Amino acid sequence: MAVSLNDFISVKLKRYSRESPWERLRVPYRNKKQKKWASVHNNEAQLHSANKRNDNCLIQRSSTWRLGDMITLVIKDIPVTWLSNEGGKLYNLWEPLHDYGTIEFMKINEPLNGQTSTTAIVQFAPPPKVPFWEPNGKINVKGVDLAVQIDITAHRSHISRQVFSKNSFRSDQLVKIPLSSFKLGQVYDERIVPLFGVDCGITVTESNLLVYFNFKKLCVLFDASFDKQIETFRLDFDFHSIIGDVGTDYYDDHISLVFRFRFSPLIFRKSKNATESRVQTFWTASHLWRRHYDILPFNVSPTTASPIELLNCHNAPIGRCNVLVLSFSIRDESDKDDIAFLLHNLEKFNLKSQLDKVVFHLVPDYKHRCSLINDKEIEEEIAYLLQACLSKNLLSEIDLPIILANLKKLSKERAKKFLRLILTSKTALINPSELDFTKSFVFYDLSSASSIHIKKLYVTPTTLRIVEDSLEAGNRVIRNFKDFANRFMRVQITDEYYKQKIRGGSDGFRNEKLYSRIQQLLTYGIKVGNQIYEFLAFGNSQLREHGAYFFASGSDLNAKQIREWMGDFSEINSVSKYAARMGQCFSTTKEINRFCVDISLQDDIVRNNHCFTDGVGMASLSVIRRLSLEVKNHDMFPSAFQFRMGGYKGVLSLAPPTKLEYHQGNLVFPRRSQDKFKSFHSTLEVIKISRFSNAHLNMQLITLLEGLGVEKTVFLELTRSQLSKMNESINSKQKSILMLRDNVDEYHSTLIIADFIQAGFLERDDAFTENLLNLYYEWVLRLIKEKQKVSVPKGAYLLGVADETGTLKGHYDDAVLSVPEIFIQITDTSTSFGSYSTGKLKTRVIVGLCIVARNPSLHPGDVRVCKAVRCDELMHLKNVIVFPTTGDRSIPAMCSGGDLDGDEYTVIWDQRLLPKIVNYPPLLESSPKKSIDFLEGKPLIDSVKEFFVNYIKYDSLGLISNAWKAWAHDHDNNPEGIFGNVCLELAEMHSKAVDFAKSGVACKMQAKYHPKRYPDFMQKTKTRSFRSETAVGKIFRYAARFQRESGRPATYNPIMNTVYDPCMKLPRFKTEYLNVAEEVKKHYDNDLRSIMARFDISTEYEVYTAFILFKDDLAKTVNEYGLREEVSFQFDLLKKKYTQEYLEKCALSNQSAFDSSEYEERINSAVAATYDVTYDQRVKSVGNGTTEVLISFPYLFSSRLCQLSRKAMLTANNF
């Protein structure tokens, strides 16, 4: 039957009900059905009176159970012995019952005290073929007679919700339609090259499309035949991965839908045995699905004794596919109605359909073309860039013959520039001609003594995602082996969307095949080009992100030699500590060159087995002064800094000025707790310095404070105040400045924006400043709504240090109300406008009661009440929080197990936030920390690799945190909130999970801790969500309402205008620098685009400020803090590089060549030249109807721009 487009469009969407003619063959008419239900109610009442614990009807011989698409059975008289560790649990039921039909759900109930038997629930979908419980309502399992009842209530609800179509099933949440065929492939020049699916080397016996609208994903379910062995597989595609519209094509009696996607699908294989139910009391059919990274039968191992490669020529190349073609047979009107219903509902998710002719292009020698990637004539660096282009689908392996032939004709440098331009352009070059390789192009090679390019690669279950070289400030290892820098590689293991980690914890048993791929990676390495990169080591922060360093070993240097150079770790007998100590050498640091320090090791202050100086030592003033110059700190001298030096790690704070002997030279005084391993390396390295930033409440802290007695109205007042100030500041310069200076972020971006506004850029309609401000508004609003991150003006986020004078009063266990003292002296950013850019900062000392907490905080005792005091002996310490070294117990340790080796603390002196329950007993370690020993008879590094895999497998930190959120707000199931046993136990588990990286001991969350439902602010599925009336829930809904009613756009939309700033007209030497500015800007733009592409960031404003707007589907899964930190770090390197490079090219790096007044004027002229070049490009771009030009280059010189503006305004006012 031929189908035309008009036929399809004219289909009227309708729901099939039980009154449909074909349905009458299956279901009694309504009057008959109502009569049937009437008898059911009578039976139900009789049963309820006989058994109060079960109000469901027991129907022995009725056929009503056949009517629905699901049936729920209650199994009684189950022996409690089944619940023992060796008792078999739910497997005892699954094994005999699964032969009767598909079991969707099983749960066995915990028996009450003294009971010898219990009950279980078993759901079949569809109902079983035969009533195995008839004729007497019993079944015999393992020699035990079990009673069987039908749960009529659950059964009836499923009958009433059914929506049938003749060949499929559909509802508002789920669509299931049979497929005539499907193909996965690669888009190639507007055609589709099929690589997997029907007629692609695999026998598919049956396939179906399932679309879960509530989970925003579509699934292809199919049976594959392998030598008479049938295996069931599932491919999952998230809606957010789909690119553009859904293509539709009609021909004869078929319709095809085309989905293009950014990321490979998740592959699942269905297990034939529910062995995991032996240890479970709760089981669903989803437990049968096992993650896979290839389409292979159960008994075939996909891992091989070879390195992982991008182009695998042996198995189905699903990782290389980026398009899905689904074909449906159209047999009658109901089939057309199914497709119309599907497309109509997809449009609700902005997935619109349009005509798209499907043209297939067969490539019979595809595997041969893939093998060309190992061409040994291609230089390694070129091979790496080529595979980076392939991994991002900017080039296609189908074109490898012509690509390789033309790259060989180019010089090495020209070939590299050609490939780097493709990477930064983000425009695919498909079916290239010889002319494409001969076009003129330029690309700037960014390098400096302080930064190094390191390869970076993401390993997903199905593919590799290779990124262009990552700019690194460097670490001790790479700086020492800088001649081999191009052989280092940062590898991160992720799920298919490469910003999401592979889930561990309770999902671990379902991911075994993925872990075997990770083991293959660690054992055999990664092959890129003709180089094999092998596992080297990982740092602590890398481990938490499932990352590690790899190295391409050779005869001149190998990974083992590098590890031996790092230091002597022979005295460490714990695998996790061994790995952590090696990881110290990979901390990103700034080396203080040509600066020798004298080391004087100090004892720790220890009392009652509590260390009060854990991780913190001292440094002399001369060391701090030199450090400040090296890091080019624009604030006052930092009072403390996080460092690495040989085997030492932690924080060094400025020694008390009263101890003159501590300042007789370049002296550092590390503590014994900071000495981690032996090393000959003695250069001082800096990780970060102490800086001021504002305090913020988050979901966890709000939840704890509310539980401890703070009124929820206080949190709402803070939220309303912050949002109303944002609204008021839109049309007020002064209010904008105040608002920004009252909310200083950790990267001081708000201070830079405030200085731009103070210098008059906003009132002169400067596009860049306008965009920064709009971005900030949108970023803050999203944070409040999604993470309840509320700013607290009377608070700070500071690095913790110890009171070396012993002046502050500490915590005493026997005190009636122990309120220890702390010292806080912070930057007062509100006292002087423009102070940030001029460096004239003032400070103030905080006095009064405060709350102190560390992120994350889940236990009521994690929030401590302290008294901030003025202390003359500590006035030399600024922008740090000083903890006492007296008392019975360390305050940082009571703040969710913190220490002083670099931890930062939130301190708030807003009296409204002081809790009624003061200093609840902290969480103490219930047992001594364990450790994992090394494997016997194997190299030490093998134990480290095994630990790495186990960490990924059992990393349950996020799972535990989310469970705590849900239970803490579910007062129906947990009336005591944060003080309930379930929350206290989860807090303790969370603490152990945090220590997993150090202890090596995993914390496994049992099924009983899984939430029964979720508060609305967690934005889970509606069926398991409830309206939270806690402060967090109210903030969530208030922010959502504010976003709707404020009139501001729901998403950030950058503005482009072409207003020239008259303040840039003044400098008289400007024309001398225009050509240089244009040249350097071109290079800067290329590298900025690289950062934007690498982190999938839409605008340069987000990179400039680190105010990154994540897509809604990803905001809850991405590690926002880590990503912002990495982006800020990368941009900071870029900024330093190009400001220095530009001034050097302008011959302005040496001030001695000019007198001071001319030098200042020439610097201002050079900066103004960058503005003019950018303005001209922007005008041209807008004139051409595009907005792709980047405009941030002049704003790298923010302080100089502000100085120029103030000078111009002063000149104008004098006239």
UniProtKB/Swiss-Prot annotation:
The organism's place on the tree of life at top rank: Eukaryota
Please name every pair of cysteines joined by a disulfide bond in this record: none
EC no. given is 2.7.7.48
Q: Which UniProt keywords apply?
A: Centromere, Chromosome, Chromosome partition, Cytoplasm, Nucleotidyltransferase, Nucleus, RNA-binding, RNA-directed RNA polymerase, RNA-mediated gene silencing, Telomere, Transferase
Reactions listed under catalytic activity:
RNA(n) + a ribonucleoside 5'-triphosphate = RNA(n+1) + diphosphate
Give the UniProt subcellular location, in the record's own words.
Cytoplasm; Nucleus; Chromosome, Telomere; Chromosome, Centromere
Gene Ontology CC terms? chromatin; chromosome, subtelomeric region; cytoplasm; cytosol; mating-type region heterochromatin; nuclear RNA-directed RNA polymerase complex; nucleus; pericentric heterochromatin
Name the principal localization, coarsely classed: cytoplasm
Which positions make up the signal peptide?
none
What does changing residue 903 to A do? Abolishes RNA-dependent RNA polymerase activity and results in loss of transcriptional silencing and heterochromatin formation at centromeres together with defects in mitotic chromosome segregation and telomere clustering
- Tell me how this protein assembles: Cid12, hrr1 and rdp1 interact forming the RNA-directed RNA polymerase complex (RDRC). The RDRC complex interacts with the RITS complex via interaction between ago1 and hrr1. Clr4 has a role in mediating this interaction.
Q: Which family does it belong to?
A: Belongs to the RdRP family.
Q: Return the protein name.
A: RNA-dependent RNA polymerase 1
Q: Which organism is it from?
A: Schizosaccharomyces pombe (strain 972 / ATCC 24843) (Fission yeast)
